[in-house]
Design a protein with these regions (language model features):
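Helix-terminus/linker motif at the lipid-water interface of multi-pass membrane proteins
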Residues: 34, 38-56, 125-132, 188-203, ...
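Small-residue-rich hydrophobic transmembrane alpha-helices
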Residues: 55-115, 152-171, 288-351, 382-404
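Signature of the first transmembrane helix
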Residues: 20-80, 84, 257-277
Length: 466
């Protein structure tokens, strides 16, 4: 089967049964993200055995990694949407060229961020409020991660390219391989393992970072071999055919940059909240970090559905199949909502057991459980915001995601938290209340924007001249 026929066949399969198509894309993503989430949970359990300061040191790194993740995933979403629309238009040449531009962008971003991290990382951690042993532990972790950052960024872009053509299984299998390897290497690099003959390296938090970097190098190597040597994908990479185009760069950036900036805003917000929470104690920051890891588990299926929506919406929009487009949007968002209702119920009743996996410190457990039980009431609203944003990205609209993030995070939650804590002298629960209010604001903006956008779409597929 030639590549054009393959493209048409995949699009037709998706159109024949959009709901089945959604899950055929989402389940492999869910599997891969599930393994990654398992790693994040296990990693935190291992680091938790090093003490509360180790958890807090890693917590101060999270805004920086959220920034890197934001740029990679945000621009990656632009890549996915661009490739999906070109495939929907049956334009393989431009789909290939879009993928090649993505690789070009990965080179620039990875080298820039890695260099900045190595030169200014410790200073940035200090600006976030880390000091003393916490600053030392945070920098131990960060400087190792910066060395491996290019491999992580490239792998993220490769996944986005494959997602654009509807291939979710292979990238998630590769990510799963890296995660399993990471879980195996973590205890070897972190602990001395005296009970097992002392063959562990005992490198502490730096060891956790080394285990991650090694696994990401292997993931990157597998992607390069399969995409450039074995030519596994529908997309083909040929340097001689590469034609630099500002139109393609703009097509990616107009969707991806607002998404990236939205995650940058979230990273800044997380840094602000770390600084607010350290006002109470290092244990409060540690509790927030643990609760955040459990959050990831709650939203695992939601991010999977959302990623699938970007691909399907992009393809259906490019093919002008508006009835299928509307059905897919409605079905995907409602599926995410009901899944989150179930997971929220579970979290509310079993939050103490979940947090107890990470630490036996009663104060940390108490703070984290309070956070989770409060947020169980707004998780379903967050799921609608996440899926709505990815739908709008699939339609080629990146700005809404940025607005949906900036207004609640910098305009609502952070100012409210600062006011309640530093001016009103309220307890830490008022930080959580501030976040919950911002969640309701984000939900309202997202839903309003989506409804108004859908109303502008034609009611039937537009006829084109043959």
């Amino acid at each position: 089967m030639d590549t054009n026929t393959e493209s048409k066949s995949r699009l037709k399969t998706f159109l024949d049964n959009p709901s089945k198509a959604l899950w055929s894309l989402a389940i492999p993503i869910m599997f891969g993200m599930g393994i990654q989430t398992l790693y994040n949970l296990v990693d935190m359990i291992f680091i938790g055995r090093l003490g509360g300061n180790a958890i807090t040191g890693i917590a101060f790194n999270m805004p920086l990694f959220f920034l890197v993740l934001g740029l990679t995933m945000g621009l990656g979403t632009g890549v996915t949407a661009s490739i999906a629309r070109f495939i929907g238009q049956d334009n393989k040449k431009e789909a290939d060229n879009s993928a090649e531009h993505a690789v070009f962008m990965a080179v620039i971003i990875s080298l820039s961020l890695s260099s900045i991290g190595l030169m200014f990382g410790k200073t940035i951690l200090a600006l976030f409020g880390a000091e003393g042993e916490i600053l030392s532990l945070g920098w131990e972790y960060l400087h190792v991660m910066c060395v491996g950052m290019p491999f992580m960024i490239f792998s993220g872009f490769f996944r986005s390219i494959l997602a654009g053509e509807g291939d979710m299984k292979f990238p998630m299998m590769v990510a799963g391989l890296g995660t399993v390897l990471n879980i195996i290497l973590d205890p070897i690099f972190i602990f001395e393992l005296e009970s097992y003959g002392g063959f562990g390296l005992g490198l502490g938090v730096a060891g956790a970072a080394m285990a991650t970097v090694i696994s990401q190098v292997i993931v990157f190597s597998v992607f390069v071999y399969m995409l450039f040597v074995k030519q596994h994908s529908y997309i083909t990479f040929r340097l001689k055919d590469f034609s630099f185009s500002m139109d393609i760069i703009w097509d990616i950036v107009k969707v991806g940059l607002p998404a990236s900036l939205s995650m940058v805003v979230m990273a800044i917000g997380q840094g602000v909240f770390n600084k607010i929470l350290i006002h109470f104690s290092a244990d409060t920051v540690a509790a927030y970090q643990i609760a955040g890891r459990i959050d990831m588990l709650v939203f695992l299926p939601i991010f999977s559905v959302a990623a699938s929506l970007t691909t399907l919406v992009g393809m259906f929009f490019g093919a002008k199949e508006y009835d299928s487009l509307r059905f897919t949007i409605r079905y995907g968002i409602m599926s995410a909502f009901f899944i989150t209702v179930l997971s929220s119920t579970f979290i509310y009743f079993f939050a103490d057991l979940a947090v107890g996996l990470f630490t036996d410190d009663e104060l940390i457990i108490s703070i984290a459980v309070t956070f989770l039980r409060l947020f169980a009431f707004v998780y379903p609203l967050i799921s609608i915001g996440i899926t709505t944003g990815r739908v709008l990205q699939g339609l080629g609209k990146g700005l809404p995601v940025l607005i949906i993030t900036i207004v609640p995070v910098l305009g609502v939650s952070a100012p409210l938290a600062v006011f309640f804590i530093f001016y009103m002298g309220k307890s830490v629960e008022w930080v959580w209340y501030s976040m919950m209010v911002s969640t309701i604001v984000a939900f309202t903006i997202a839903l309003t924007w989506l409804v108004s956008t859908i109303r502008t779409l034609p009611t039937v597929k537009l006829e084109t001249n043959q």
